[in-house]
UniProtKB/Swiss-Prot annotation:
Species of provenance: Arabidopsis thaliana (Mouse-ear cress)
Gene3D superfamilies: NAD(P)-binding Rossmann-like Domain
Statement: the UniProt record of this protein carries the keyword Oxidoreductase: yes
Binding-site residues, NADP(+): 15-39
Protein name as it appears in the record: Short-chain dehydrogenase/reductase SDRA
Gene Ontology BP terms: fatty acid metabolic process; indolebutyric acid metabolic process; response to indolebutyric acid; root hair elongation
EC numbers: 1.1.-.-
Keyword Magnesium listed: no
A GO CC term attached to the entry: peroxisome
Knockout mutant characteristics: Defective in root hair expansion. Mutant plants are resistant to the inhibitory effect of intermediate levels of indole-3-butyric acid (IBA) and 2,4-DB on root elongation.
Short name of one Pfam family: adh_short_C2
Residues annotated for substrate binding in this entry: 146
Amino acid sequence: MEKKLPRRLEGKVAIVTASTQGIGFGITERFGLEGASVVVSSRKQANVDEAVAKLKSKGIDAYGIVCHVSNAQHRRNLVEKTVQKYGKIDIVVCNAAANPSTDPILSSKEAVLDKLWEINVKSSILLLQDMAPHLEKGSSVIFITSIAGFSPQGAMAMYGVTKTALLGLTKALAAEMAPDTRVNAVAPGFVPTHFASFITGSSEVREGIEEKTLLNRLGTTGDMAAAAAFLASDDSSYITGETLVVAGGMPSRL
């Protein structure tokens, strides 16, 4: 029997970037099931169409827009088409991310460093610059950072550094966008999605990760979606500038 969810987001309009699969799709689905109208976005039209169809099959009001977050015109289209259809924006989840290389930082090519910064940090800032005039009073911005942001090392070192930057960006924008918009972040632990398959695809590595968590398991997209829904809702109306770590008890101090 499916758990009945509260309708905390009734009447809200939510945009989630990179939301056709994995954590992004999980968040979009949860928002929709809690009553929000959701805007799905991703780089490929086929993926957007498939995700929208899945959401609509569950009775969710879903709208899809192709958006590569590093493309300025795509970002503007995402904002403009959402406002044209719904008249407002209440919730923004910046989920798009890239990890094009597992090289050590001092061996990383400049093009890789540029892409990591552009997709993981800069694109979210530019997107919010476009969205800010349309955000409703009481709106919520959520960055998806990572447990790797607290201890950037190994194959995720430079990726982790960009996620550390999001911890600071959350604090900075919470101050800049207050009091009308709250800005928070979710820091997922290890979740077995396609994006993380280079790590979680190995049973040996998975077991090692599970041993490091107090709850002895990997995270799920549902775990991350529940955290995002809380931060998007009025249940967190007195919370801003914070990062909610959802990592089963893995160490999370800078």
